[in-house]
């Protein structure tokens, strides 16, 4: 075997020689020099020594000490500061594996001992019961001696308190063992032992129970008989006279899917839907996530989405309406009384500038059109006029395209529509729209052909154009009266009123003046001094000052009523328009008004409508976002013009919102970030500042606080009183945001007839100009067989060895193309220019 010295061994184990000699001395080996030989036995002895030393170190519990120091500064009076240093120290000791193993063994021994004791007690209890059954068996088998058994068994029961007192310790273990034995037998229902006195009493009652079971044997799962229940009363103690109840579990797992009836209202949350289907909300959320709709448990779903989910999960859906409150309100508003004839409500409709308001002016003998900005109507005006033939209520609607919703409301609230058509202008887009609104509302038409005093008036042309849209004059065999009028001269106005009142007689309009007032909102605005003001048209009943009214989602008590001339009135009957003050907000035009006797009822219905409107709006907005998720992916690239819009009345605000949101295209859009009725306030200015928006005031002005913020922050605020102007300005702003298009104009085309070589420019094309003019230093394209093969710049242009700025059609020239020498005979050189063109919507 190879001899190994201390030095070689130190080199093998990668340890200094001095360190190895020291370890060998500690191991009791005689080596003192590096050249001494180490045998295998000595190596083994050294290895054993090193292992034992390492094991001792390992067995020592390892400690980890954590120290933390935090320094803070405490300020005291007099601008002084005190440095506070907090030191914390924690020591963690790791337990050895031997300790952990010993503890585990100890726990197992204790558990095994407990189980053995329990098993031994169970065996003793079973043995004791077997002995009791053996003792009771002869008593049941001998009927002659049976009467003596109850007496013998009853005596210990009466002496139970005295007998149980000396040995309570022996009674408790038997009760515990019996309880464990009952738990091991699941097929026998357990009795309610909460009122039991202990095992001793049960043991004394055992013979009595055995005799009862012998008298009425029954299977364990069968219901208990009357005798069994009567004998199950506890005897003695607190439980005297109480019947023992069986605690058998009645739940059975369903073998198939459970189909439930799910009632879904207009809105429902995910949690409510899952509760009705008896499934976890997480399952519904997971199902909707698979459908591509991420929701939360409190997400409000609209009726259609909830119906789809419930039906997909296999349940029956019943769509219900959450209008119990509305139904009770409708029942309370029913009124029976004597009906009388009422005045007709007539709406004047037609295209803009066709003379609607001027015609009403002549009828009212008042100059209303002069007071409208720009001479066009921008509000719904309501007036009632006393004529020789009776009273007529007129509604004047705007004719501009932006006021479509106003015209639709006017048609719904009216009995007869006067369609004004200019004789010199003919049928226009808003004229056709007015006809459609009247037909949709089922309202009869009377056509007033205005401006017949102008040259070029053609009545037959208007009859022909209107007949295309289903309006046929009486002269042509239809049922629509046509009346020629002149609002300026007053011609034909009496005949027009005659036709209107004739239509009203045919309709037989009735109303009940003694009923509570009911009507519709024509217009609403926010007055700085008087608060919300609503113009309402009373359709039935009588509206009185002091009435509690419910208008849409607003309510209030009428503090004052004004007629169309601004004069206060105490009451208003059917077909009378009035302004009412006292509402808690500005209602939307078209909202229904009802008089209620109870303020509490009005408040309850108003709050219900507000919450319902908010829930439906949120549900629809969320559904819209999910449906258009892919369409909206590119919306972030759109340029947006933010606008804060304030108007004098609610109808104009709605019309402006619709008109402005309709502007824009795929690259630019308008977003009305805020709006309302009333003047521009400080909060509106702050909203415009935060959203980088433009402030627009339509027939309103800004207060001092808003003007101060606008001046300090340099906001853009503009006032308007004509709807044309605001729409035109927004169009110009959007056009500026579009930028410009680059358009190419072809200036000239030259054909290559020959190719020359120049030491300075390379290949020179001898060309004939075919079309237009060829200019130097302009971009060109080289076409070969009408295919673009090069695009560059025209570097050299000569005519008879002289440089030329341009060469016209029909002349020859030499053309040098920059950085291109592959010119061939027959190629065409196209000279063009790029022009920036402003874009428009």
UniProtKB/Swiss-Prot annotation:
Region (G3) residue spans:
396-399
One GO molecular function term? GTP binding
Which domain of life does the protein's organism represent?
Answer: Bacteria
* Residues annotated to bind GTP: 350-357, 396-400, 450-453
Segment G5: which positions? 486-488
Q: Where is the tr-type G domain?
A: 341-510
Keywords noted in UniProt = Cytoplasm, GTP-binding, Initiation factor, Nucleotide-binding, Protein biosynthesis
Q: Which Pfam families match?
A: EF-G_D2, GTP_EFTU, IF-2, IF2_assoc, IF2_N
Ranges of compositional bias, category Low complexity: 136-175
- Where in or outside the cell is it found? Cytoplasm
Record's compositionally biased regions (Basic residues): 235-248
Q: Where is this region: Disordered?
A: 94-255
Name the segments for region: G1: 350-357
Q: Which InterPro entries does the annotation name?
A: DNA-bd_dom_put_sf, EF-G-like_DII, IF2_assoc_dom_bac, IF2_II, IF2_N, P-loop_NTPase, Small_GTP-bd, T_Tr_GTP-bd_dom
Which residue ranges does the record annotate as region G4?
Answer: 450-453
Q: Where is the composition biased (Basic and acidic residues)?
A: 96-135, 176-217, 225-234
Q: Supply one GO CC term from the record.
A: cytosol
Chain positions covered by the region annotation G2: 375-379
| Family named by the database record | Belongs to the TRAFAC class translation factor GTPase superfamily. Classic translation factor GTPase family. IF-2 subfamily.
> What is this protein's function per UniProt?
One of the essential components for the initiation of protein synthesis. Protects formylmethionyl-tRNA from spontaneous hydrolysis and promotes its binding to the 30S ribosomal subunits. Also involved in the hydrolysis of GTP during the formation of the 70S ribosomal complex.
Q: What is this protein called?
A: Translation initiation factor IF-2
- What gene name does this entry carry? infB
